[in-house]
Amino acid sequence: MKLVPVALMYLGSLAFLGADTARLDVAAEFRKKWNKWALSRGKRELRLSSSYPTGIADLKAGPAQTVIRPQDVKGSSRSPQASIPDAARIRVKRYRQSMNNFQGLRSFGCRFGTCTVQKLAHQIYQFTDKDKDGVAPRSKISPQGYGRRRRRSLPEASLGRTLRSQEPQAHGAPASPAHQVLATLFRI
């Protein structure tokens, strides 16, 4: 009975130590690629930095002439040309490709189904919200009410009626039903 756990422990340690001591060539290949990339980048930066003026004598000599290759410029055709050693390299960032679209067409926020449902429910609530009343009560909108903006935002027709309904009418002239309704509303 004790032999089975001991054998399993022995096989597990053998597998663990055997895998740990085995050399993988993946790390060596990665190191080679990394060194090659770092070396080419260092050469490129050295070449570019030597083309820029570094001292006062270089600035007095005149501006350095920079060459822009057609394949470096975004949107141009990719024609193979000989590379010029002192050419300025224009790099186009990857995210600029997505920024070319018109900003107004792109919606911000998440694009999950739940967010879409929430946005739709919010729009439906805004369009069908009957509880809100965008108009203040008549007693507040009247010229005796508060706020210059409210008095200014009155429609001209209702402003004329309001002024006419408050003016004393001649006792002999019968009032129209609309004027009577407005007069009772103002009294309330």
From Swiss-Prot:
Site note Required for CALCRL receptor interaction applies to 116, 125
GO CC terms, sorted: cytoplasm; extracellular space
Q: Which UniProt keywords apply?
A: Amidation, Cleavage on pair of basic residues, Disulfide bond, Hormone, Secreted, Signal
Residues recorded with modification Tyrosine amide: 146
Where do the record's region annotations for Disordered lie?
Answer: 131-177
Record PTM Arginine amide, positions in chain: 41
As recorded in UniProt, coiled-coil segments are none
Q: What is its main location?
A: secreted
Gene Ontology molecular function: adrenomedullin receptor binding; hormone activity
What protein family is recorded?
Answer: Belongs to the adrenomedullin family.
Protein name in the entry: Pro-adrenomedullin
Q: What organism is the protein native to?
A: Sus scrofa (Pig)
Q: What is the lineage of its organism?
A: Eukaryota, Metazoa, Chordata, Craniata, Vertebrata
